[in-house]
UniProtKB/Swiss-Prot annotation:
UniProt superkingdom: Bacteria
Summary of subunit composition and partner proteins: Part of the 50S ribosomal subunit. Contacts protein L20.
Family assignment from sequence similarity: Belongs to the bacterial ribosomal protein bL21 family.
Gene Ontology cellular-component terms listed: cytoplasm; ribonucleoprotein complex; ribosome
A single GO BP: translation
Protein's UniProt name: Large ribosomal subunit protein bL21
Pfam family, one: Ribosomal_L21p
Keywords, sorted A to Z: Ribonucleoprotein, Ribosomal protein, RNA-binding, rRNA-binding
Length: 100
């Protein structure tokens, strides 16, 4: 059995005991998070969400992804600008899926 949940502006397909990476959430390691925005669970589609369904996850880690380097070049001026970016993420483990 799997479910489709919404976190931020993205959707994730999850199963029990899955570990997923989502956009950074303001939670501490070890906390439990309940997602109420469930689009699909156990062959039931929501309109837009399944009533009473929820997915419970545990926060395993807060971190940042690998660095992405971006170079901006301005032509005819021999000028370069170098930028770096590391996207923060939260690693979650699916603990329970409730049908509702």
């Amino acid at each position: 059995m799997f479910a489709v949940i919404a976190s931020g502006s993205k959707q994730y397909r999850v199963k029990l005991n899955d570990e997923i990476y989502v956009e950074k959430l303001n939670s501490q390691v070890g906390e439990k998070i309940v997602f109420d925005k469930v689009y699909f669970v156990n062959n039931t589609f929501g309109k837009p969400f399944v009533k009473g369904a929820s997915v419970t996850c545990e926060v395993l880690k807060q971190g940042r992804q690998k660095k992405i380097n971006v170079i901006k070049h301005i032509s005819q001026k021999h000028h370069l600008k170098k930028y770096g970016h590391r996207q923060p993420y939260t690693k979650l483990k699916v603990v329970a899926i409730n049908h509702g």
